[in-house]
Amino acid sequence: MADYLLEIGLEEIPAHLVTESENQLIERIKNFFSDNLLDYKKIQTFSTPRRLAVLVHDLSNYSQSKDEELRGPSLKVAKDESGNWSRAAEGFARSQGTSPAEFDERDGYVYLNKHIEGVSAEEILKKIGIEVVEKMKFSTYMKWADFKLEYVRPIRWLVSLLDSKIVPFQILDVKADRFTRGHRFLSGGKISISEAGDYEETLNNAYVIVDAKVRKNSIRNQIRKIADTNDWNLHVDPDLLEEVNNIVEYPTAFAGVFDDKYLNLPEIVLTTSMRDNQRFFYVTNKQGKILPHFISVRNGDSNQIENVVKGNEKVLVARLEDAEFFFEEDQKHNIDFFMKKAERLVFHEKIGTMTEHMKRVEKIAALLANQLAFNDQEKKDLKRAANICKFDLTTAMVGEFAELQGTMAGIYAKIFGENQTVCQALSEQYLPTSSEGDLPKSKVGAMLALADKLDTLFSFFAAGIIPSGSNDPYGLRRAALGIVRIIGQQKWNFSVSKLLHSLKTAVDKHEDGFLIDFADTKEISRKVIEFFLDRIRQQSSDIRYDLLDASTGKVNEGIINYIFKRVRILASHVADPDFRDVIEALTRVQNLAEKNKSNVEIDPELFVTNSEKRLYQLTKDKDPIVLLSKGDHTVYQFLASLKEPINNYFDENMIMDKNPIIKNNRVAQINLLNNLISSLGDLRKVVVK
């Protein structure tokens, strides 16, 4: 047994790529050892902005031996007419280091049983550069010198040690050795690692805390200690903590101060300036009010920390001075001033201006508000919010702090005299901003956010701008997922197809300055609905694949909330004792209906058996949409109650009766029943055992 160390030394990696690169490295290492039949006890991973590393403990000295059977050429090819081994057979044997005499013959082929002895770990590890290091994939790449290899950042050194022995390999002009690098400023030159197991201690002595988890805990403890000492409430944003952890190798926390006059700025401006722009942690008093202090972390020790504090304070104050100036300047104008400027703001060159976008958002919001029974005041507030929703994009503050779009619209709207409902809706219009982000809390805000995202999708799809692969520069996947989540939260039921058709009627590209042509609404809605289905599958990744396929199989005009309900309904009943029997009865109907379509009206006078009459009485007045809208389980409970009547129906009746009139009536009844069952989707895709 031995310990093996691999370290990839790099120029500074962007903070957001460090953790995912570390995770990728350990997965590739595990796969490498699995493929090469090398056993080990455990693997430690390490990462800093300048390195990715693994330390493998108790690695076997040799890979496992194995026996394998290789299939060679067919007997027709392996032997000639006289039964002698052909050149093809001899070539196959030679390639495996044996002779045809070792062949087994069966099933028309020759086979070779081969015993493969284990290979030394050292020999296997020589391939780790090509099979692991070079195969790493990243979302961002760099090229350096005149090399063809692209990597997240240029490779500057490599360490490859099996206990104390160097395992050689080379990538470009960098040869693996035992020399690492310490902290860029606190440690000088190359540092020799005697043994693989000494890695962490060696780097600790060189001012590098190489274990990301240890480093993060150190940061957390240091900043909490400062906050506790000063009786501050500390707000530790986990994303900010992760980012700070990935830009330092030897963290030292410190506190800074700024003039309390800047506390007159909106709180979000202060926290954005500190958190997003400077990577500072803000603090509050016990009542939750922001204090004129911050906590930050330097990449180094406490030597001359006072200079670092002053420098960070100076940078923050400059940022806050700008914010204060922009805030005061913007208040010298009004919403109409900014709306006028928005007429020149391009939404997209193929789609039109931001003003045109706002007009379409207002149309969509109005259509949905009428359909979903908003009251008069809600409609009035929604119309006002939609009409001015993007005015803040032309303010000086958002021009400098782009991440505050929407938020500043709500703040400025309040200053300019808009009512609270409009202000809140404006501040919520971009929510959710991520797959797990907060949703709008107000009804009007949810509708504004929904309408904004719907127009974005409709417009880009109409212009032929549809995401492909991982490429999504306009965030359309995020918008679609936001739509799905808002609809699920609000339980709003509306048809995407009908909405788009109504929008086409309301929006004429030759009037009111609209640029988009929604001519082919059927094709646009088909693509948009399929796009939504992909997001629903993503949002429901915890649910069995077959239930997802079944739920998203048959879509009723793109009523997104109903699709969401289907997924959850099936998932909640899959463990029922009679689930299999229910699904089998219902899919029997769906299979027949798929093969036998009918537009014939059912004539109850043609019923022959009691089972026909009973099934008709149970289903004749049922509307699948009404069933779905009543509650999450109403539709399933109703369909499950039809299990016995359906089974009796098939036991007593021959659907394809010799009498064509009887047959057509029964086929029509099967199609009526299928229409109800399909409200849950294509249940033939459900896997029952």
From Swiss-Prot:
Keywords associated with the record: Aminoacyl-tRNA synthetase, ATP-binding, Cytoplasm, Ligase, Nucleotide-binding, Protein biosynthesis
Example GO BP: arginyl-tRNA aminoacylation
EC number: 6.1.1.14
Assembly and interaction partners: Tetramer of two alpha and two beta subunits.
Bilayer-crossing regions: none
Cited Pfam families: DALR_1, tRNA_synt_2f
Organism: Oenococcus oeni (strain ATCC BAA-331 / PSU-1)
EC category name: ligase
InterPro entries in UniProt: DALR_anticod-bd (IPR008909), Gly-tRNA-synth_bsu (IPR015944), Gly-tRNA-synth_heterodimer (IPR006194)
The reaction(s) this protein catalyses: tRNA(Gly) + glycine + ATP = glycyl-tRNA(Gly) + AMP + diphosphate
UniProt-recorded name of the protein: Glycine--tRNA ligase beta subunit
One Gene Ontology molecular-function label: glycine-tRNA ligase activity
